[in-house]
């Protein structure tokens, strides 16, 4: 049975739009856990556009399930992670001009630097995942640099508007799951998943945890966060 990690970045996005103190992502995390989330995910970006350092430190004190920190593999972020000690760090690519993470890491570029960052985090007792496209070369490279997990980027699947394209992406995801499992990697997935499409990916099997944020926060505007999380839990766990 797959788990659900709720990404609460966009609670902070709303807060930062007015430069105030609400809505509070720490309170959102508590509600999400109460509603059945298996973990909380936040992305501390280098430009601090939504989640702030203070949020991360408070979440480490309050999250009762699992805290997953998405971050770039920079010296600054590795240092913060080693100080805060999230349960997992998911290393992601990051560009200042992007609205959201647009694709997976190219693990093959700068493998030694990435391996060094992974080693430092693991030496600090932190499980490390790499956010990658469903590509065999990226899966193999993730294993070579010593990652514990991969998180498969499902954005291309989610954006597919034709049945043939969707099926092709599902096949790529399934192949990445099988290869990652064969190589001893844990498998997570996320990006662009919503209440309409998540079951198609969950039905493939082999995915330990889905990290979903935008669609849950969007639904929460109309239904409340508790209901939005419970609805997604049902889809992920009982696909």
From Swiss-Prot:
Name the catalysed reactions: 3-amino-2-oxopropyl phosphate + 1-deoxy-D-xylulose 5-phosphate = pyridoxine 5'-phosphate + phosphate + 2 H2O + H(+)
Q: What class of enzyme is it?
A: transferase
Q: Name one GO biological process term.
A: pyridoxine biosynthetic process
Query: EC number(s)?
Result: 2.6.99.2
> Can you tell me which residues form the catalytic site?
43 (proton acceptor), 70 (proton acceptor), 191 (proton donor)
The UniProt entry, under Pfam families, shows: PdxJ
The primary location reported for this protein is cytoplasm
* Site label Transition state stabilizer, positions: 151
Cellular compartments annotated = Cytoplasm
Give the pathway listed in the UniProt entry for this protein. Answer: Cofactor biosynthesis; pyridoxine 5'-phosphate biosynthesis; pyridoxine 5'-phosphate from D-erythrose 4-phosphate: step 5/5
Q: Where on this chain does 1-deoxy-D-xylulose 5-phosphate bind?
A: 9-10, 45, 50, 100
Q: Where does 3-amino-2-oxopropyl phosphate bind?
A: 7, 18, 192, 213-214
Q: Which UniProt keywords apply?
A: Cytoplasm, Pyridoxine biosynthesis, Transferase
State the superkingdom. Answer: Bacteria
What GO cellular-component annotations does this UniProt entry give? cytosol
**GO terms for MF:** pyridoxine 5'-phosphate synthase activity
Give the function comment from the record: Catalyzes the complicated ring closure reaction between the two acyclic compounds 1-deoxy-D-xylulose-5-phosphate (DXP) and 3-amino-2-oxopropyl phosphate (1-amino-acetone-3-phosphate or AAP) to form pyridoxine 5'-phosphate (PNP) and inorganic phosphate.
> Its quaternary structure?
Homooctamer; tetramer of dimers.
Q: So what family is this one in?
A: Belongs to the PNP synthase family.
Q: What is this protein called?
A: Pyridoxine 5'-phosphate synthase
Identify the species of origin. Geobacter sulfurreducens (strain ATCC 51573 / DSM 12127 / PCA)
Write the gene name: pdxJ
């Amino acid at each position: 049975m797959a788990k659900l990690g709720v990404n609460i970045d966009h609670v902070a996005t709303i807060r930062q739009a007015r430069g105030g103190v609400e809505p509070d992502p720490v309170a959102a995390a508590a509600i999400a856990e109460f509603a059945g989330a298996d973990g909380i995910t936040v992305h501390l970006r280098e430009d601090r556009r939504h989640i702030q350092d203070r949020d991360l430190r408070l979440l480490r004190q309050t999250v009762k399930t699992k805290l997953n920190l998405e971050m770039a593999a920079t010296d600054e972020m590795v240092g913060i992670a080693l100080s805060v000690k999230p349960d997992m760090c998911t290393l992601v690519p990051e560009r200042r001009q992007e609205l959201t993470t647009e694709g997976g890491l190219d693990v093959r570029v700068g493998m030694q630097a990435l391996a060094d960052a992974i080693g430092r985090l693991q030496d600090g007792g932190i499980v490390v995942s790499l956010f990658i496209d469903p590509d065999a070369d990226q899966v193999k490279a993730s294993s070579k640099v010593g990652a514990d997990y991969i998180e498969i980027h499902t954005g291309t699947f989610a954006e597919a508007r034709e049945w043939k394209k969707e099926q092709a992406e599902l096949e790529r995801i399934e192949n990445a799951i099988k290869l990652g499992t064969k190589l001893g990697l844990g498998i997570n997935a996320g990006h662009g998943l919503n209440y309409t499409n998540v079951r198609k990916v969950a039905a493939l099997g082999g995915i330990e945890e889905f990290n979903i944020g935008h669609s849950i926060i969007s639904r929460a505007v109309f239904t409340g966060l508790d209901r939005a999380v419970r609805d997604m839990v049902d889809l992920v766990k009982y696909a």
